[in-house]
């Protein structure tokens, strides 16, 4: 497959599920995976024999909890000692370790202990989404737009971009999820005049609210707010914790010590949570949950709402903040658009509706697919698509947090205020604090507090070689330049000497070095090759198994009773039994060994089958092997064993 020019796709890289779409022929297609689902679990599993990504990984999680990784988005761009990371680790069955304060997940893969940065795990999910898109399009694609929560920090944005690089993607843009959802809401709705739209995006792990003014294809973000650690996973955790105690009281056993039991309970709780969006009660039935004890219980919607009451109210504070920042009143919002799977929860809808004085909520877009839809549109625009409905479409996004530097006394001096439209550039003159100061330390921070100690350090660099001068005389010009992806470049110039230095804020806190990225790209290629080899091995095994069983079944059937001698029948049955026995005793055989066994089996079978065929065998040929494979393995010029589609 070769990649044609001008094609790109949009990926919603979610905490719990991911989604991919492509814009072509004037419309967006949300692409289904090979199981027919339009969303794919953001899960990666490692076993003794292979790596699994997506649904196959999630489906085996209760059997292999400690080696199945999910929630990578909650780790990406964070420090190991972040309070949210430490809190999450109590709920995760897989192990998280520290590598110079960067979190890494530790798993057992093919008998060895392996550690992966969250960027690497996310890149594996991105590889899966890339493969889904390529299977649909029929050719290779590397250009992509990836979405992130609007309230993500600079380091988390850069780490997401790194994950794209590791997945072999050319990341055209990092787009905020609510902005992408707004495109999905408004595309093809031109000519309605200026609208103030509030996007309420509550997913599996993050919450975002953005207020946009949409007018004739121009999407201008007025304000954004959110919580990068609030979503469906937290609701699941509440329900899991709720059921721990009754089990312990009744049976005097603590299931929290058993990762498999906890994982099975979590899966059941997630299912119950979904049921409670449409029913007032849900049953939980788990056979032999722990030490042979069955766990049968139920939960009402009212009890679930009570368990999560504070979490359900949590999004309202960011909504108020966004309204204040946008300088808009509730009544000035024309549409309240729901995005993200967790907005299906009736109580969340009720709280939001009450907040807006009973206003009708807009549920016109698919909450699971809207973000990928908008990302696909933006990808097409960036690739120069000339479709009529994309003409004059323009995104004007904002910086979610204030950006500044530390000045004397640890004061945060802001250069770019939060909710400033990006891309943007701001320049300010600074000077020295003491006489004959030879250099200055530029420390870049992100946050809203007055003192830098309460904000997040993004990066720092020194500007040295300043000529001796009294304090306050040197003029140091500092420029903050933030691009459309929300990634910041900071430069400083001493105006008298011309000395300068600069930094791209990619944040050491969770940021990978260039060398680490190069190493991981090579490892990703190796894992991809391993996956392909495993697929080929399984295919060879399945083909051999199919031929052996089908051949045995055919010659033992009534149709051939009068057509084949007892001696020939015995030869084929014995060889088939021998092959089946070999497979049972050689579960870890390589692809070449399976292919050799297939050739040996076909040597015995083909001459007898050819003789029968020439004699007019009824009922057709037994199925199981592709024609190409059979021809390779046959010394006969007779007919081959064909696979039935």
From Swiss-Prot:
Q: What is this protein called?
A: Heat shock 70 kDa protein
Give start-end positions of Low complexity composition bias: 623-636
Q: Which family does it belong to?
A: Belongs to the heat shock protein 70 family.
Q: Which Pfam family is one of this chain's hits? A: HSP70
Q: What is the primary gene name for this protein?
A: HSP70
Write out the ranges of the annotated region (Disordered). 615-645
Drop me one GO molecular function for this one: ATP binding
Keyword tags? ATP-binding, Nucleotide-binding, Stress response
């Amino acid at each position: 497959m070769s990649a044609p020019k001008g094609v790109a796709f949009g990926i919603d890289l979610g905490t719990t599920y991911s989604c991919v779409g492509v814009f072509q022929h004037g419309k967006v297609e949300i692409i289904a995976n090979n199981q027919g689902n339009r969303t794919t679990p953001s899960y990666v599993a490692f076993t003794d024999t292979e790596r699994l990504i997506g649904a196959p990984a999630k489906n085996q999680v209760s059997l292999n909890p400690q080696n199945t990784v999910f929630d990578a988005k909650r780790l990406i761009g964070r420090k190991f000692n972040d309070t949210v990371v430490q809190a999450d680790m109590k709920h995760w069955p897989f192990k998280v370790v520290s590598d110079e304060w960067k979190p890494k997940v530790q798993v057992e893969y093919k008998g060895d202990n392996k550690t992966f940065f969250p960027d690497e795990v996310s890149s594996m999910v991105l590889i899966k989404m890339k493969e889904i898109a390529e299977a649909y399009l029929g050719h290779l694609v590397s250009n992509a737009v990836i979405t992130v929560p609007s309230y993500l920090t600079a380091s988390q944005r850069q780490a997401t971009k790194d994950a794209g690089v590791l997945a072999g993607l050319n990341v055209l843009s990092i787009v905020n999820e609510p902005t992408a959802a707004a495109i999905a809401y408004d595309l093809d709705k031109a000519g309605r005049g200026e609208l103030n739209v509030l996007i309420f995006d509550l997913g599996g792990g993050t919450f975002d609210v953005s207020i946009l003014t949409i007018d004739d294809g121009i999407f201008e973000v007025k304000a954004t707010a959110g919580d990068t650690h609030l979503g469906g996973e937290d609701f699941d955790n509440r329900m899991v914790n709720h059921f721990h105690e009754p089990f312990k009281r009744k049976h005097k056993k603590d299931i929290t010590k058993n990762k498999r039991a906890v994982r099975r309970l979590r899966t059941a709780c997630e299912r119950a949570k979904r049921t409670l969006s449409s029913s007032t009660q849900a049953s939980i039935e788990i056979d032999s949950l722990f030490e042979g004890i069955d766990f049968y219980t139920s939960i009402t919607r009212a009890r679930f709402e009570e368990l999560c009451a504070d979490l359900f109210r949590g999004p309202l504070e960011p909504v108020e903040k966004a309204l204040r920042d946008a300088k808009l009143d509730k009544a000035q919002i024309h549409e309240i658009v729901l995005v993200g799977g967790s907005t299906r929860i009736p109580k969340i809808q009720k709280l939001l509706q009450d907040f807006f004085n009973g206003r009708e909520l807009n549920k016109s877009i698919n909450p699971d697919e809207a973000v990928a839809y908008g990302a696909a549109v933006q990808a097409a625009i960036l690739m120069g698509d000339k479709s009529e409905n994309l003409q004059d479409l323009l995104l004007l996004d904002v910086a979610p947090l204030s950006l500044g530097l530390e000045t004397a006394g640890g004061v945060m001096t802001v250069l770019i205020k939060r909710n400033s439209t990006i891309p943007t550039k701001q320049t300010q003159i600074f000077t020295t604090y003491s006489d004959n100061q030879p250099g200055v330390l530029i420390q870049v921070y992100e946050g809203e507090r007055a003192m830098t100690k309460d904000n997040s350090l993004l990066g720092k660099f020194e500007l040295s070689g300043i000529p001796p001068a009294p304090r306050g005389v040197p003029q140091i010009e500092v420029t903050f330049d933030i691009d459309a992806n929300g990634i910041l470049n900071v430069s400083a110039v001493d105006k008298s000497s011309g000395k300068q230095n600069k930094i791209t804020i990619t944040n050491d806190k969770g940021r990978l070095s260039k060398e680490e990225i190069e190493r991981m790209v090579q490892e990703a290629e190796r894992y991809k090759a391993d996956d392909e080899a495993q697929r080929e091995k399984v295919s060879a095994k399945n083909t051999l198994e199919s031929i052996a069983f089908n051949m045995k079944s055919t010659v033992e059937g009534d149709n051939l009773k009068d057509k084949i001698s007892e001696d020939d029948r015995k030869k084929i049955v014995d060889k088939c039994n021998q092959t089946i026995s070999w497979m049972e005793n050689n579960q870890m055989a390589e692809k070449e060994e399976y292919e050799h066994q297939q050739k040996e089996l076909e040597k015995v079978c083909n001459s007898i089958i050819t003789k029968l065929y020439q004699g007019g065998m009824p009922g057709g040929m037994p199925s199981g092997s592709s024609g190409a494979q059979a021809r390779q393995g046959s010394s006969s010029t007779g007919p081959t064993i064909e696979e039935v589609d």
